[in-house]
């Protein structure tokens, strides 16, 4: 210790002893202006053999027990360094040099657990709401709470928990050591916003040293003195992380990251779950770059979190909204394309849309009448075109195609748009013009149309352009030219049935549906309007 530092400390000791009680407030206001005093006091505390250590500890205790808050904070800034020296001396079994620091720590503890009347304090803690972001979670990952009567009753409810009573301690033991130190760290964290930068640096150095001392990682540090392994408590490490987290965002970014890694290293070795949870949450929430510390006197945490108010508007998606969107889309297609076919509505994903024609809005009825008019107008020209296409395809048909064609033509092909409503599952169908369905015998119509529509999607041939419900006449003509020998599962089943008996129908009007008569990838219902 230099002579100048010693003179500064001795002057400070004599000045406070001669200070009257009326000037304590003014003395506390000017104490922070002494720039050389704080570094000199750190040197005295770090040297356990210094003769000024005992009077300095006594002076710090007198400042803390005074009624002036600023004098208490002046003593609190040395608390991390005092803890490190105490733990280091405890491991080295140097009880004689450790007596004054131990008395100072116990004195601060006994002052904090009791009020002015000597009664024990009960500390209260407010449980934060999950709707606000923290280092553990983001509120966007939690679903919105239902607006119920119970939720409204608990809207302004503040949940508070209370700590147990802390008994007074006369001396340190192995059982109560970290109980006292954890409570002292709690007191330090409650006033950490008033601490200077030198106190933050001392906190980070203390946290790193107590975690890696006695472990192989200690040799990677550039410390002058080595220390034995220090026993730690999970609660003390959590309180240490609380102070380190604030110091990282207020000028100690590099030191804070170093001590954070050291705490995770020690917590993994000791299998402490609570420090691991807090430390990993802190590490995952850190930004990539150091926060802006150009502003002097800034005492806030700058953490980038997800906003509580969602920026993306979430509109409820219901069956009605899907139908409205589909009707608008089909109306636009009917106006632009002028097709003569009837587009069937897609089934809502996740919903069952088996509504009848009477449940449709009035605005869709004119579109149905316009479609019927377009069917009548184009029927004559379409039938002539179909005859030419059928004659061209018939010449290139194979014997197998003709067999399947005979069975396929036997199905009723007269479908009427006026009497049915089609509700397929994820497919678009189109009815060629000129197909009429009688309004009676609705049950056989459902069964027959289900089978025929299944075959029309699986069996791709040129004959489907004029004889069945297909994907479209023009598309069927192109597919017939390129894929004349393409068969699906249903067409192969029909071929086997045709070889067993050509004159036998695939499905009779009164026969029940079987697994072979249904397409595995498509389902359609035709509901007759009564």
Curated annotation (Swiss-Prot):
The modification Phosphothreonine is found at residues 30, 306. GO terms for cellular component: cytosol; plasma membrane. GO terms for biological process: phosphatidylinositol phosphate biosynthetic process; protein localization to plasma membrane. Residues 328-410, 498-530 are annotated as: Disordered. Residues 353-373, 514-530 have a biased composition (Polar residues). The modification Phosphoserine is found at residues 321, 341, 430, 442, 444, 491. Component of a phosphatidylinositol 4-kinase (PI4K) complex, composed of PI4KA, EFR3 (EFR3A or EFR3B), TTC7 (TTC7A or TTC7B) and HYCC (HYCC1 or HYCC2). Belongs to the Hyccin family. Component of a complex required to localize phosphatidylinositol 4-kinase (PI4K) to the plasma membrane. PANTHER family: HYCCIN 2 (PTHR31220:SF3), HYCCIN RELATED (PTHR31220). This is Hyccin 2. It comes from Pongo abelii (Sumatran orangutan). The lineage of its organism: Eukaryota, Metazoa, Chordata, Craniata, Vertebrata. The gene is HYCC2.
């Amino acid at each position: 210790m230099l002579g100048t530092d010693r003179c500064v400390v001795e002057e400070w000791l004599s000045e406070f002893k001669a200070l009257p009680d009326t000037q304590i407030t003014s003395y506390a206001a000017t104490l922070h202006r002494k720039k050389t005093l704080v570094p000199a006091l750190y040197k005295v505390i770090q040297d356990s053999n210094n003769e000024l250590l005992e009077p300095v500890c006594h002076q710090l205790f007198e400042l803390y027990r005074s009624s002036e808050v600023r004098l208490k904070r002046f003593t609190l800034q040395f608390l991390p360094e005092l803890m490190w020296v105490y733990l280091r001396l405890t491991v080295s079994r140097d009880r004689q040099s450790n007596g004054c620091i131990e008395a100072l720590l116990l004195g601060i503890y006994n002052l904090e657990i009791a009020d002015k009347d000597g009664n024990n304090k009960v500390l209260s803690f407010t449980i934060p709401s999950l709707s606000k972001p923290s280092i553990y979670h983001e509120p966007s990952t939690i679903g919105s709470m239902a607006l119920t009567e119970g939720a409204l009753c608990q809207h302004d409810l503040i949940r508070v928990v209370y700590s147990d009573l802390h008994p007074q301690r006369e001396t340190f033991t192995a059982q109560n050591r970290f109980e006292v130190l954890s409570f002292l760290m709690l007191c330090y964290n409650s006033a950490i916003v008033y601490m200077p930068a030198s106190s933050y640096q001392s906190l980070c150095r203390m946290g790193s040293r107590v975690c890696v001392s006695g472990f192989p990682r200690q040799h990677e540090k550039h410390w002058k003195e080595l220390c034995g392994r220090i026993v730690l408590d999970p609660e003390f490490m959590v309180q240490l992380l609380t102070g380190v987290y604030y110091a990282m965002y207020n000028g100690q970014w590099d030191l804070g990251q170093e001590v954070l890694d050291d705490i995770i290293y020690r917590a993994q070795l000791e299998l402490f779950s609570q420090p691991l949870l807090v430390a990993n949450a802190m590490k995952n929430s850190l930004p990539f770059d150091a926060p802006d510390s150009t502003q002097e006197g800034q005492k806030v945490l700058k953490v980038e979190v997800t906003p509580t108010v969602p920026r993306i508007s979430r509109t409820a998606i219901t069956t009605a909204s899907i139908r409205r969107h589909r009707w608008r889309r089909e109306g636009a297609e009917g106006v632009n394309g002028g097709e003569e076919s009837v587009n069937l509505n897609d089934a809502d994903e996740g919903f069952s849309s088996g509504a009848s024609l009477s449940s449709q809005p009035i605005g869709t009825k004119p579109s149905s009448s316009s479609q019927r008019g377009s069917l009548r107008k184009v029927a004559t020209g379409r039938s002539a075109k179909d005859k030419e296409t059928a004659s061209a395809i018939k010449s290139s048909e194979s014997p197998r195609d003709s067999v399947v064609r005979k069975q396929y033509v036997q199905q009723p092909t007269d479908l009427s748009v006026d009497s049915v409503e089609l509700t397929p599952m994820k497919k678009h169908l189109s009815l060629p013009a000129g197909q009429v369905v009688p309004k009676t015998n609705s049950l056989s119509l459902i069964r027959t149309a289900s089978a025929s529509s299944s075959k029309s999607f699986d069996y791709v041939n040129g004959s489907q352009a004029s004889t069945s419900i297909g994907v479209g006449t023009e598309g069927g003509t192109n597919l017939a030219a390129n894929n004349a020998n393409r068969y699906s599962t249903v067409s192969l089943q029909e071929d086997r049935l045709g070889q067993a008996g050509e004159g036998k129908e695939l499905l009779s009007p009164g026969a029940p549906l079987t697994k072979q008569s249904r397409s595995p990838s498509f389902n359609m219902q035709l509901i007759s309007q009564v």
